[in-house]
């Protein structure tokens, strides 16, 4: 989006992000692009003439954005949220597998020559969001990938995808595996308290690869929020709807058919370890009820 603003209208742009950037692949991507991004808390929004939100929406639990600010542009591939409708311009394509695909079509329509770093970043975005075009992808995602890949830096892309992982990554992974319980064709794992939510989603992806498993739910606590990730290969049920139900009225939840997330606030009275375990147990029961047999006994994945 900044490429269009710069190339077509000579408009200077600042890029902000919500939360900390901790995932190894994202850090490697920022390093390759040489991007200097700032957290939303550091930005003085009154200095800007226009505000755009990309690959996210206002009102989502993973976006710390001042609700009193009106957005000019929202572009995303997740199902539309009520707060998004107040933006001056919205382009929400929930059938698309990646927001990078939407932005590629903008660049193509504007007849802008896509620089190698931008092409590399967009290829990574499509690969990451669709798991190499194997999940929630469309013909548009495939066409964008095929057009962008020849323009990308394959060696840099490899360094991003295979970015070195910090040792604490494996400590968190061990917890996810140790805590994983199998309920028939479903796996549930509570990772405890974490610094950031990235591992919760990564664990859900990994556990879904277990033999004979069709659903995974992983949970973890970050600050005063209980984060939930859902993954499935079951075409008969919709992960996004289940996530919304799990989140309830006080939380945030939603997503696609095959992957979804929920964020549930923990107030002062219910954020003790005991209260969190009770909440996780309740969410597990509701998840099992929504995805099949709720009375199935859990067995450890790793004996």
Predicted regions, residues:
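Hydrophobic helix-and-loop "lid/oligomerization" segment in the mid-to-C-terminal part
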Residues: 1-25, 131-303
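A short, gly/pro- and small-residue-rich
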Residues: 54-56, 64-81
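Short alpha-helices
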Residues: 77-146, 281
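N-terminal small/polar loop signature for handling phosphorylated ligands or for N-terminal nucleophile
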Residues: 1-66
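Short, hinge-like loop/turn segments at secondary-structure boundaries
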Residues: 30-34, 92-93, 234-235
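Short, structured coil segments at secondary-structure junctions
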Residues: 33, 68-70, 85-87
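Hydrophobic/aromatic beta-strand patches that form the interior of the parallel beta-sheet core
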Residues: 16, 52, 71-75, 90-92, ...
């Amino acid at each position: 989006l900044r490429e269009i603003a710069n190339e077509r209208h000579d408009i200077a742009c600042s890029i902000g992000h919500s939360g900390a950037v901790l995932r190894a692949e994202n850090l490697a991507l920022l390093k390759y692009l040489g991007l200097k991004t700032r957290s939303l808390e550091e930005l003085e929004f009154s200095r800007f003439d226009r505000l755009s939100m990309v690959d996210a929406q206002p009102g989502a639990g993973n976006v710390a954005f001042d609700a009193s600010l009106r957005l000019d542009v929202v572009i995303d591939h997740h199902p539309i949220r009520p707060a998004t409708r107040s933006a001056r311009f919205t382009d929400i394509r929930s059938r698309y597998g990646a927001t990078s695909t939407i932005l590629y079509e903008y660049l193509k329509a504007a007849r802008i020559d896509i620089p190698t770093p931008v092409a590399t970043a967009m290829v990574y975005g499509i690969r990451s969001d669709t798991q190499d075009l194997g999940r929630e992808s469309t013909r548009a995602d495939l066409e964008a990938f095929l057009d962008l890949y020849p323009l990308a830096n394959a060696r840099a892309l490899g360094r991003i995808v295979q970015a070195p992982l910090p040792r604490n990554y494996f400590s968190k992974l061990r917890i996810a595996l140790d805590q994983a319980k199998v309920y028939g064709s479903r796996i549930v794992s509570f990772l405890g308290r974490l610094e950031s939510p990235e591992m919760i989603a990564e664990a859900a992806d990994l556990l879904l690869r277990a033999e004979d498993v069709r659903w995974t739910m992983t949970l973890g606590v970050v600050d005063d929020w209980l984060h939930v990730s859902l993954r499935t290969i079951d075409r008969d049920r919709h992960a996004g709807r289940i996530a919304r139900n799990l989140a309830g009225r006080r939380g945030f939840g939603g997503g696609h058919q095959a992957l979804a997330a929920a964020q549930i606030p923990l107030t002062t009275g219910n954020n003790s370890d005991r209260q969190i375990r009770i909440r996780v147990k309740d969410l597990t029961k509701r998840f099992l009820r929504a995805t099949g047999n709720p009375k199935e006994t859990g067995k450890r994945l790793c004996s």
